[in-house]
Amino acid sequence: MPQVFPPEFFDYEIKDIDAYAGLLSDARVEISQLLPGRLRGHHTRVRVPAGEISWIKTNLPLRGRGQFPSGAWMLSLVTRASSLSLQHGAEVRAGSLFVHQPGAIHDGIYGRNFSVVCIGVPSHRFERYLDRMPSVRPGRARRTWRVVRASAVGRTDLIERFNGAARTLRHDEAFRVSMTAVESMIDDLTADFVNALRDAIPSEAQSALRDGAAIVRCAEAALISGSEHTLQLDELCRATGVAKRSLSRAFRLILGIGPATYLRHYRLNEARRALVQDRNRGTTVTEVALRFGFHHLGRFSEQYQTMFGEAPSVTRSGSNRV
């Protein structure tokens, strides 16, 4: 059985421009300081076979140029910048996303109090995302890079997720020594980045809308076609063929609610339909609640009242009819 090594961890405290520039020169990156002062910050990186995550924070404006490795896509999210910052001449600020193809040149001005989280994803692992993003696929994209800003909806949450992940990697040793945990984090952040990128590019946003609608329709079909009204979230994922994160995003994009809320509302509607249809059959509210997966009668009544503005017993008796 092959030996599994823990993730490679690198945490460098930036104390001056000379030492940091010397460190980066080994990675074919040139930097220079644009304003007087003492450069401070940190450069943290965790690397596993599935990719790497880097977090760079600096206090002074820098000019930086270099070339990314040829075997990986680089996905970067700016999480903070308090003065003008550029990437390939395009202005970037908190919430800006830039994606570089393998081996691409990067050329930027990084402003005061600049913070960026970068994900390196091996080409073979990133391939699965390219069909969903034709505008960045090599051979179809006009450039080897793309710079956009995440849409206002969800931008703050995206920044916080990336910052939170970076803080965890830097400060939680128990987490970062777990290969499985780090690889899972890379996969989650990559999916978040790709979704944000698609939403920010008009042509990709329309594609995301179509994909989301298709997932929701598939989920609805799974519920309608089966007699199993207590379908769980994991079963819905299997029925639609997508992960929980993708399922959640599709439902929020199309319906404005998460899949768990949708399932609950679906079961409440089915319960209401049964209460109306079974009025003359002697079926009790408890029997209907249990049939549709509500095992706590008090909670069922409360949720039902909130949903329909009346108690289930009122629906069953038909006393609400004019």
Residue ranges and their predicted role:
Residues 215-219, 263-268:
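Generic hydrophobic, amphipathic alpha-helix propensity
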Residues 45, 53-55, 75, 97-99, ...:
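Conserved hydrophobic/aromatic beta-strand scaffold that supports enzyme active sites
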Residues 253-254, 265, 306-307:
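Alpha-helical DNA-recognition elements
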Residues 1-38, 84-227, 232-234, 238-244, ...:
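Alpha-helical bundle regulatory/interaction domains
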Residues 68, 212, 264:
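Short, conserved glycine- and acidic-residue-centered signature motifs
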Residues 247, 251, 299-300, 304:
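Short hydrophobic/aromatic patch on the recognition helix
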